[in-house]
Regions:
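A beta-strand edge to alpha-helix "cap/lid" segment located at domain peripheries
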Residues: 59-129
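A solvent-exposed, acidic/Ser-Thr-rich amphipathic alpha-helical stretch
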Residues: 21, 27-78
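A short, structure-level motif marking secondary-structure boundaries and short turns
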Residues: 3-4, 42, 88
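Short, flexible active-site loop motifs that bind/organize anionic cofactors or intermediates
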Residues: 9-12, 43, 115
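C-terminal ligand-sensing/allosteric alpha-helical core of TetR-family HTH transcriptional regulators
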Residues: 6, 53-56, 83
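Short, low-complexity N-terminal intrinsically disordered segments enriched in polar/charged residues
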Residues: 1-28
Length: 129
């Protein structure tokens, strides 16, 4: 399976809220980097390994209801994949609805995701936390 297909499958599973299934093609030592100021989001920082990545995603799911998860554009760069994603969310604690736009950069090696780097609107994130 090509890297772009692996990432597309992950996004579909995540959109379907199959969080564990979304990570099926992640290496055990996958690195997830969420680029942000940790003072703005408790989810910012780096997760090392599939279990930490899963824990981070489950924590997000506890804080937010994901109403729609839309990969707007996915760019195939061979073993590198870039994507713009639009996430329609509700903060569970406040009921506030918003749309978070993210840029994700994936690295795939030997059919497994080994790294994901995510950038997002930090000002928006700070306003909803």
């Amino acid at each position: 399976m090509r890297a772009v297909e692996i990432v597309s499958d992950l996004y579909q599973s995540y959109a379907d809220r199959d969080i564990e299934g979304a990570l099926v093609h992640c290496a055990e030592d996958v690195v997830f980097r969420w680029i942000a100021d940790p003072r703005q989001s408790r989810h910012a920082g780096t997760a090392h390994g599939k279990q930490e990545f899963l824990a981070r995603l489950l924590a997000l799911d506890d804080d937010f209801e994901y109403r729609h998860f839309v990969p707007v554009e996915i760019i195939d760069g061979g073993d590198k994949v870039a994507a713009q994603v639009e996430i329609h969310m509700t903060r569970r604690a406040t009921g506030e609805d918003f749309i978070m736009r993210t840029a994700n950069f994936w690295t795939v090696r030997d059919g497994e995701i080994i790294e994901m780097v995510a950038y997002y609107d930090t000002a928006l994130a700070a306003s909803v936390f």
